């Protein structure tokens, strides 16, 4: 028979973290500060493993504790509070990476210059595209820019933006 052992200190620390999460769920901000002090090094190290820069890891760290504070009441005490916190950090880091891949940071003035430089885009098409860009969502703008301006194929856009090809 195989037994898994958990050290007394690990068990005790999990209980302390669960107690802090319970207090946070009741609005205790000092409990959030204590949780942060006890777990920040581990969360930051994990965020650094996923982030491209230390600044991004810091952002994930701070966003993680904001999310912990706002959703502490949803934590189900099962002896794994660090796993719950790390899952929040992982999801936030992934969202940040997706968003960074989707950012193209092209201003409206630059959009006109891009279209003007594309000889295969007529002036009528240019006006139509500029008008469309003003009413499209950010995701839709990125799709149009990648396809109409950069000539990227739909399946490549889908992979780049982590979307189904049918959405593109």
Model features per residue range: what roles?
Residues 2-5, 10-17, 95, 102-131, ...:
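Internal acidic/polar
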Residues 19-24, 128-136:
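Short amphipathic alpha-helical boundary/capping segments
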Residues 70-77, 86-107:
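Arg/Lys-rich amphipathic alpha helix in sigma70-family domain 2
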Residues 37-41, 49-52, 145-152, 162:
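Short helix-capping/turn signature of helix-turn-helix
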Residues 45, 59-66, 70, 79-91:
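Structural recognition of an alpha-helix C-terminal capping motif at a helix-to-coil junction
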Residues 6-11, 25-34, 44-63, 165:
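Short, charged helix-capping/linker segments at alpha-helix termini
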Residues 55, 134, 138-142, 150-167:
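Helix-turn-helix DNA-binding module
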Residues 129, 143-144:
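Short alpha-helical "packing" element that flanks the helix-turn-helix/winged-helix DNA-binding module
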């Amino acid at each position: 028979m195989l037994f898994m052992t958990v050290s007394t200190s690990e068990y005790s620390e999990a209980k302390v973290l669960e107690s802090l999460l319970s207090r946070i769920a009741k609005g205790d901000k000092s409990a959030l500060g204590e949780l942060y002090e006890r777990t920040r090094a581990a969360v930051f190290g994990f965020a650094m493993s996923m982030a491209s820069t230390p600044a991004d890891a810091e952002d994930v760290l701070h966003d993680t504790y904001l999310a912990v504070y706002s959703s502490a009441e949803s934590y189900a005490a099962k002896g794994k509070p660090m796993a719950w916190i790390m899952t929040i950090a992982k999801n936030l880091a992934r969202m940040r990476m997706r968003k960074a891949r989707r950012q193209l940071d092209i201003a409206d003035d630059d959009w006109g210059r891009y279209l003007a430089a594309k000889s295969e885009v007529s002036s009528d098409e240019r006006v139509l595209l500029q008008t469309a860009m003003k009413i499209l969502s950010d995701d839709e703008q990125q799709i149009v820019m990648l396809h109409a301006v950069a000539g990227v194929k739909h399946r490549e856009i889908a992979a780049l933006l982590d979307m189904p090809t049918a959405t593109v």
